[in-house]
Design a protein with these regions (language model features):
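Cross-family detector of peptidyl-prolyl cis-trans isomerase
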Residues: 2-312
Length: 312
C-alpha cells in the first residue's frame, strides 16, 4: 500500500527505540516552564519560554484519561502538535488538530515512545524531547531539525489498538460463488483461497463480517488490518498482520494515500466490518503494476480488510 509517514514521528537514524514497559511511563520531572492549556480534542495553547531548553526528557500528563493503558505493542490514534525549540526561539512544525487524527504505529522517536507508553487513552501528554531522544546529533535536515534542537510534543490519545485487533461484527459470508473464500478465527490473519475462475472485470466489494459502528466517510482517518493477495497465484504480497500492527490512512485523500479500489470500496462501510475487495488493475496499481510486491500490470488483487476505527 502507499503510505505517507509523518517525518517527525519516525526515527530516520539508526537509533534504538528505548521504550518503557507497561504501567506508568518512566521519565524525569516535567519541565515547569513549558505550559499547555485547552480542552482535550482541541488545538492546545502551548507556551514555551524564550530561553534554552533543558537537556533531559521531561513528560507531563496534562489531562488524565480514564481509558485503557497504551501498551508497548499497541498502535494508537491521536492528535498532536509539534514545536521545534531551537536555542531561545521556537516554532510550530506540525499539527493534526486542524486536519485529521493520526495512527501512531511502528517505531516512534525514542523520547516519544517513553512518554506515551503506559499512558491512558483520553490523556493529553506533554513531552519535551532533547536531541538524544529524538534524531540525535545529526538532526533531521529534511524536516528542518538541527542536531541541537529540542522537540516539544503535545499528544491527545484517542484510542489504542492491540496488535491482534480484528473485525468485531456479525459473520455474514465467507465469500465463494466465483469469489475467493476467506477463513480465519477471531484475532488472526484471514486465509484467502482464490478460485481457478477468471477474476471479475470490475471492482467487487463483499461484506464478510457486518460491523455495527458508524459508516466510513470521505476524509476520515481509517484504521484497518488487512491481507492482500494476487488473484492469479493466490500469493499473499502484503499484510498488516505480519508487521504486527494495524495500518492507518486518510480515505479519499488528495493526493490518494491508498490504491483507488480502497478509496472506492471502503467508503460507506461500517466500523467493525470485515470486507473483501476484489480489485481489477485499473483500481489497483494500474499499467505499471508494483514490481517490488510482485504485482504485474494485469494482476487483479484480493484484499480482506478489517475496519477497526474511523476518526474525524
Amino acid at each position: 500500500m502507499r503510505r505517507i509517514a509523518l517525518i517527525l514521528m519516525l526515527p530516520l537514524l539508526g537509533v534504538g527505540v528505548l521504550a518503557g514497559c507497561g504501567g506508568s511511563p518512566a521519565h524525569s520531572a516535567a519541565n515547569p516552564t513549558v505550559t499547555v492549556s485547552g480542552p482535550f480534542g482541541k488545538a492546545p495553547g502551548v507556551t514555551i519560554p524564550a530561553k534554552k531548553a533543558t537537556t533531559g526528557l521531561t513528560v507531563k500528563t496534562v489531562i488524565h484519561g480514564s481509558g485503557p493503558v497504551v501498551g508497548k505493542t499497541d498502535a494508537f490514534v491521536g492528535n498532536y502538535a509539534i514545536y521545534i525549540w531551537s536555542g531561545t526561539a521556537h516554532r510550530l512544525a506540525q499539527s493534526s488538530f486542524t486536519a485529521h487524527p493520526t495512527l501512531f504505529a511502528g517505531q516512534l522517536l525514542p523520547g516519544l515512545e517513553k512518554a506515551l507508553i503506559g499512558q491512558k487513552v483520553g490523556s493529553r501528554v506533554l513531552a519535551v524531547i532533547p536531541p538524544k531522544d529524538a534524531f540525535g546529533s545529526t538532526g533531521n535536515p529534511q524536516a528542518g531539525i538541527k542536531g541541537t534542537d529540542t522537540l516539544v510534543f503535545v499528544v491527545d490519545l484517542i484510542k489504542a489498538f492491540p496488535s491482534n485487533a480484528s473485525a468485531s461484527g456479525q459473520h455474514v459470508s465467507s465469500g465463494g460463488s466465483g469469489l475467493p473464500k476467506v477463513t480465519t478465527g477471531t484475532g488472526a490473519a484471514p486465509q484467502i483461497k482464490v478460485p481457478s475462475a477468471k477474476p471479475p472485470a470490475k471492482l467487487v466489494t463483499k461484506t464478510l463480517v457486518k460491523g455495527s459502528g458508524p459508516a466510513i466517510a470521505k476524509g476520515q482517518t481509517v484504521v484497518v488490518q488487512y491481507v492482500g493477495a494476487i488473484w492469479k497465484s493466490g500469493k499473499v504480497f502484503d499484510a498488516s498482520w505480519k508487521r504486527g500492527q494495524p495500518f492507518g490512512f486518510t480515505i479519499a485523500a488528495s493526493p490518494s494515500q491508498v490504491i483507488p479500489g480502497w478509496d472506492k470500496g471502503l467508503v460507506g462501510q461500517n466500523v467493525g466490518s470485515r470486507v473483501m475487495l476484489v480489485v481489477p488493475p485499473a483500481d489497483g496499481y494500474g499499467k505499471s503494476g508494483n514490481s517490488q510486491a510482485g504485482i504485474q500490470p494485469k494482476d487483479t488483487l484480493v484484499f480482506v480488510v478489517d475496519i477497526l476505527g474511523a476518526f474525524s
